A protein has these predicted regions:
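Primarily membrane-embedded glycan-assembly and transfer machineries that use lipid-linked glycans
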Residues: 2-172, 197-335, 419-427, 431-557
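Ampipathic, surface-exposed secondary-structure segments
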Residues: 86, 330-358, 545
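Transmembrane alpha-helices and membrane-interface helical segments
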Residues: 112, 116, 156-167, 194-198, ...
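Hydrophobic core segments of transmembrane alpha-helices in multi-pass, intramembrane catalytic enzymes
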Residues: 150-159, 185-188, 205, 338-346, ...
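Transmembrane helices and adjacent periplasmic/lumenal helix-loop junctions
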Residues: 175-194, 329-340
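Short amphipathic alpha-helical segments
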Residues: 320, 324, 335, 339, ...
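Aromatic-enriched
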Residues: 347-435, 456
Length: 557
C-alpha cells in the first residue's frame, strides 16, 4: 500500500523537467509568503543582525563584546567569537551587496549538497529528480535563505562528513562534524554518539576541530570575552523556553500546548513551571532512552554488511537518527534547522536506509516530509476563533514532521536489529509475550474470545484516554484549560482557592494527617461529610493516588 504522498513523489521522480518546473514554481510562491515577512527591509534579518554585524565589527573595530542586549542573544556573536572572522570579508561590501552575495553562496552550497547527497544514494534508485524537487519546495530551506542564516551550509557539511566516513576517512569526517557542532551547538550530540560507538578516529577529529576553534578564539579574543559569549549567548537558553512560533522544539510545543497563542510572537526567554520541567524531562528522557536501547540492541549483532562504501545500514540509520534527535530535543530549535531532515529523506529515497517497505513507513515518512516542508510564514498576532486549536497544532507542524520522521527511523532501526540470531534469545516474561502477541495481531485470527475481548477493551481505553481527552483539551477554551492547570498546581502545592477543588484539598489534608501519619482517629467520611459538612464527590481510594502525587512532587522538586 502506497501513501498518496509517496506515490506523488515517485511520479515526480520520473521527470527531471517536471521536478524542476513544479518545484521552481512552488519555490517562487513560497518565497513570496515565507518569513521574514514584508517590509523587504527585514529580508536577511539574521544575516544583518548577526553575521554581517559581527563581520563589520571585527573588520572596522576589532574584537569587542556585542552584549548585553535587550533580547536574547539572537544578534551579534551567535557563534563562538572566532567564527565571526568568516564573515569579515563581506564587510567590504555594502549591506545589500553582502546579503545577496551571501545568498548566492548559499545557493552554491545547497546545490553542492544536493549533488553530493545524490552520490551517496544507490545508482539504481535514480532519485536525482526527486531530491531536486524536495530541495526546491522545502519551506525551512527557503526560510533559511530569507533569514540569511547558515543552516543550509551546515547541510552541506553533514553530507560531506558522511561521504568522508563512507570513504574510510574517519578523522577527516570528525573534523567536519566538529565544525558542524561549532556552528550549530545541538550537533554536539554527534560527539556523544561516536563516543558510545567507540569510533575514536571520528571522535579525535571532532575534538581536534573544536579544540582548535576554542583555542584560537581564546588567543584572539581573550578569556573574558569568550566567557561573556557563553554567559549571554549559550547559558540563558539552557532550561528556559523561547516560545516564538518559529521555534520548533519539545519545549516550545509543550509551552504552546498549555499557553495557546499568548506568546507566539515572543522571542524572549521564559522560565518554565515545575510541571513543564517534569513533562519535558519525561519526554526527552523517553526519546533518548529509546534511542540508546536501539543502539545497544544493534551493538549485540554481528557487523552488518556495507550498503554504500564502508557504511552499513546501522551506520547510516544511526547517523541520520542522531541529527533528527538533535533537532527535536534541542532547547531552541528554529524552524530552519529542519532543513537538515533532507539528509534522511534523501537517503531513504536513495535506497540507503533499508527501512521496512510497508504502508506504515510510507505514511510516516510521507507525513514527516509534508509537515516539515511546509512554508514558515509570519503568523498574525490574532488567529481569531481558531486560535486555541491552531496555536496548539498547526503552529507546531514542523516539529510534528520531525517527530514522524524520527518514529520512521527508529522503527527502521528496530526492524534492522531482528535477525534470526536474536529470534530465539528472548527472555520476556509470559505476560509481556502475551501483550506483544495481542498488540501485533492485526485482526482476530488466532486469538481466543477472551483475548479478543481483552484486546478490544485495551484499544477502547487507550483511545478514550489519549485521543478523546486530547481532542477535548485542544479544543477547550483557553480559560478553562488554564484554570484546570492552575487548580492542579495549587492542589500539588497544598493550596486551596475555596472553589470546587476545596473539598478535595481538605479531604487530602485530613487523609494525610489521620491515615498516613499515625495515630488513626476517625473515619474519613464521618469527619468530612458529617462534622465539616463538605460534599466530597470522589471515592476514598482516590486519595491514595493524590497523596502519592504529592509525595512524588515533594521528592522531585
Amino acid at each position: 500500500m502506497r501513501s498518496p504522498m509517496h506515490s506523488m513523489l515517485r511520479a515526480v521522480d520520473r521527470s527531471w523537467l517536471g521536478a524542476g518546473l513544479i518545484g521552481g514554481l512552488i519555490l517562487f510562491l513560497v518565497w513570496q509568503i515565507s518569513a521574514p515577512a514584508p517590509p523587504a527591509s527585514r529580508l536577511f534579518a539574521d544575516f544583518f543582525d548577526a553575521y554581517y554585524a559581527v563581520g563589520e565589527l571585527l573588520w572596522r573595530t576589532g574584537p569587542a563584546a556585542t552584549w548585553p542586549l535587550d533580547e536574547p542573544c539572537i544578534a551579534g556573536f551567535v557563534n563562538i567569537p572566532i567564527l565571526g572572522w568568516l564573515f569579515a570579508p563581506l564587510a567590504l561590501l555594502s549591506k545589500q551587496a553582502a546579503a545577496w552575495t551571501f545568498l548566492g553562496l548559499g545557493v552554491v552550497a545547497v546545490s553542492a549538497a544536493w549533488a553530493l547527497l545524490r552520490r551517496l544514494c544507490r545508482p539504481e534508485a535514480e532519485c536525482g529528480a526527486l531530491l531536486l524537487f524536495l530541495f526546491l519546495v522545502n519551506g525551512p530551506m527557503i526560510h533559511s535563505f530569507r533569514e540569511g542564516n547558515i543552516t543550509h551550509f551546515v547541510l552541506l557539511l553533514l553530507v560531506l562528513a558522511l561521504l568522508l566516513w563512507r570513504a574510510g576517512s574517519e578523522y577527516a569526517a570528525g573534523l567536519v562534524l566538529g565544525l558542524c557542532a561549532a556552528l550549530k551547538l545541538p550537533l554536539l550530540l554527534y560527539g556523544v554518539y561516536f563516543v558510545l560507538r567507540r569510533r575514536w578516529r571520528i571522535v579525535a577529529g571532532g575534538a581536534t576541530m573544536i579544540g582548535f576553534i576554542v583555542a584560537l578564539s581564546l588567543a584572539v579574543f581573550g578569556l573574558a570575552l569568550n566567557i561573556g559569549w557563553h554567559d549571554y549567548c549559550v547559558a540563558p537558553f539552557v532550561g528556559r523556553i523561547m516560545p516564538g512560533f518559529n521555534v520548533q522544539s519539545i519545549d516550545a510545543f509543550l509551552f504552546r500546548l498549555l499557553d495557546g497563542q499568548a506568546h507566539l510572537h515572543a522571542w524572549y526567554l521564559i522560565e518554565p513551571t515545575r510541571a513543564h520541567k517534569f513533562m519535558r524531562t519525561l519526554v526527552v528522557a523517553a526519546i533518548f532512552a529509546g534511542a540508546f536501547l536501539l543502539m545497544r540492541r544493534a551493538k549485540r549483532l554481528e557487523p552488518m554488511p556495507a550498503v554504500t562504501g564502508t557504511l552499513s545500514t546501522r551506520d547510516l540509520l544511526e547517523f541520520v537518527l542522531v541529527v533528527n534527535l538533535a533537532l527535536v530535543t534541542s532547547p531552541v530549535s528554529w524552524s530552519h534547522y529542519y532543513l537538515l531532515l533532507l539528509l534522511p529523506w534523501g537517503l531513504y529515497f536513495g535506497g540507503c536506509l533499508s527501512l521496512p517497505d510497508d504502508a506504515a513507513t510510507k505514511w510516516l515518512m510521507g507525513g514527516g516530509i509534508v509537515l516539515a516542508s511546509l512554508p514558515v510564514v509570519m503568523l498574525p498576532k490574532d488567529l481569531g476563533v481558531l486560535a486555541p486549536l491552531m496555536s496548539r497544532t498547526l503552529v507546531s507542524a514542523t516539529f510534528f514532521g520531525g517527530m514522524l520522521t524520527l518514529v520512521a527511523l527508529a522503527r527502521g532501526a528496530w526492524y534492522a536489529t531482528q535477525p534470526s540470531a536474536l529470534a530465539g534469545r528472548t527472555s520476556r516474561p509470559s505476560w509481556v509475550a502475551a501483550a506483544i502477541r495481542l498488540a501485533r495481531s492485526g485482526g482476530r485470527g488466532g486469538l481466543s474470545p477472551s483475548e479478543v475481548l481483552t484486546r478490544n477493551m485495551v484499544i477502547f481505553l487507550v483511545i478514550n484516554a489519549c485521543v478523546v481527552n486530547a481532542i477535548l483539551w485542544i479544543t477547550a477554551p483557553f480559560g478553562f484549560a488554564d484554570t484546570v492547570l492552575h487548580h492542579t498546581r495549587d492542589f500539588l502545592l497544598g493550596r486551596s482557592n475555596d472553589d470546587s477543588w476545596g473539598p478535595m484539598m481538605h479531604a487530602l489534608e485530613y487523609f494525610e494527617n489521620e491515615y498516613v501519619r499515625p495515630p488513626y482517629t476517625a473515619p474519613l467520611y464521618t469527619e468530612l461529610v458529617f462534622h465539616r459538612g463538605e460534599k466530597f464527590q470522589y471515592p476514598p481510594s482516590s486519595l491514595f493516588f493524590f497523596a502519592g502525587m504529592r509525595a512524588a512532587d515533594a521528592l522531585m522538586f
